């Protein structure tokens, strides 16, 4: 004999509680994604600064006097030796000597990868906002049903 499963009807309050939990979860996810985007934006800014600094030093040429920040508000004078070679971090505390062009190319590729990741996270946020809109519509329906009673 087949047993019939009886669907337990949720009260409007239970439905609203469940919808509110889902809404809070989506909002928490959005905030987490925004925090990740903020970190990515800072990394992109740092990489662009590095690229601009390398370009400026290359244009400056060898033998020019530059000021190097050493912390707080202190700077020291130094002479530019050019940027024919750049020491770049390649991960986990390891650095490698690269030509200027290789270093700039690597920086640009990192920026492009981070921008692609940022776009993906922004799309995920947009999807979450769409889900929130759907949930809000359900909240309105439940509220209207409750008001009719």
Swiss-Prot record:
One of its GO terms (molecular function) is unfolded protein binding. The keyword Chaperone applies. Coiled coil: none annotated. Keywords: Chaperone, Cytoplasm. GO terms for biological process: protein folding. It comes from the Bacteria. It is found in: Cytoplasm. Its main location: cytoplasm. GO terms for cellular component: cytoplasm; prefoldin complex. InterPro entries: PFD_alpha_archaea, Prefoldin, Prefoldin_subunit_alpha. Pfam families: Prefoldin (PF02996). Molecular chaperone capable of stabilizing a range of proteins. Belongs to the prefoldin subunit alpha family. This is Putative prefoldin subunit alpha.
């Amino acid at each position: 004999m087949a047993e019939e499963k009886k669907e337990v009807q949720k009260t409007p309050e239970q439905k609203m509680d469940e919808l509110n939990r889902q809404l809070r979860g989506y909002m928490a996810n959005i905030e987490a994604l925004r925090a990740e985007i903020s970190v990515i934006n800072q990394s992109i800014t740092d990489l662009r600064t590095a690229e601009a600094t390398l370009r400026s030093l290359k244009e400056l040429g060898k033998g020019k006097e530059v000021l190097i920040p050493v912390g707080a508000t202190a700077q020291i004078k130094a002479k530019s030796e050019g940027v024919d070679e750049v020491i770049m971090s390649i991960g986990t505390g390891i650095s490698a000597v690269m030509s200027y062009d290789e270093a700039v190319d690597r920086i640009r590729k990192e920026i492009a990868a981070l921008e692609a990741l940022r776009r993906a996270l922004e799309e995920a946020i947009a999807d979450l906002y769409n889900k929130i809109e759907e949930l809000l519509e359900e909240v309105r329906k439940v509220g209207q049903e409750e008001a009719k009673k």
